[in-house]
Amino acid sequence: MPIHIAVQGDTIAKLAKVKDVPSKVIWDDPKNKSDLQGGTLKRTDPNLLLPGDPVEVPDLETKKDSGGTEQVHKFKLADELCVLKLKLLDGNHKPHKSMKFDIFIDGVKVPTSGGPTDTTTTATTNGDGEIEVKNLRPEAARATLSYEGRTVELDIGWLDPIETPSGVLGRLQNLGYYRVEMTDPVPVVPETDPELVGAVKAFQSQYVYNPETEADKITGTVDEKTRTTLKEK
């Protein structure tokens, strides 16, 4: 079985589309269970891979089916579609409720679960500021979000696993606690970088620990509770 070395933007769903192998077959492969999801990597989400991750791609299995002679038979390969979830927050990290927006996937306007099923009407976020795009093609590369005169470009699948330093940095960036130019590969920032430590402290103060009773835990170091809270946000 061939091994694919992940690059920035790779997901199991994208690999499944390219290799014509169901994503569940790839993710559940014994080698990926032991080396990718276990070992030192401990990847927990098939849509979050780090460049350099080794992914075992199983060979296709031949399947036989019967059909009557002198008849026309149709065999349809089911598409594996994904879901893109976004959440809009204001400067105080409060959700943008019922905000009008348009979203485009690779330049094409798409409907969302929070709005109309057609693409001619502007949709709105829900009560938690959330946007959900269903039936997303696995190979989709970029989302363009327009709201309140702003346009935001998002590279789909580029967020690194939360278990990695770059995954922590990316989430702090998305939440507005840290600013760095995201490149390919994602920039390496030392965990002792003063700005990064300050960003982690700010996040811990707001979401993880009580500044009045747990001030000693607000260290700027990404502990397990901080990592879990970042993942939830």
Place the predicted regions along the sequence by residue.
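A short, amphipathic beta-strand motif
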Residues: C82-N92
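Acidic, Ser/Thr/Pro/Gly-enriched interdomain connector segments
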Residues: D90-H93, V133-P194
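Short, acidic Ser/Thr/Gly-rich low-complexity loop/linker segments typical of extracellular
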Residues: V7, V108-E130, R179
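Primarily a LysM-type cell-wall glycan-binding module
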Residues: M1-P22, D79-C82, E163-Y177, T183-G198, ...
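Extracellular LysM carbohydrate-binding repeats and other cell-envelope/extracellular binding modules
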Residues: P22-V72, Q206-K233
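Short Pro-Gly-centered beta-turn/loop motif in secreted/extracellular proteins
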Residues: K17-D20, N126-R142
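Short, ordered, surface-exposed loop/turn motifs in non-cytosolic proteins
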Residues: V21, H93-T112
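LysM (lysin motif) carbohydrate-binding repeats in extracellular/periplasmic proteins that recognize
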Residues: V7-N47, F104-V108, Y178-R179, T192-N210
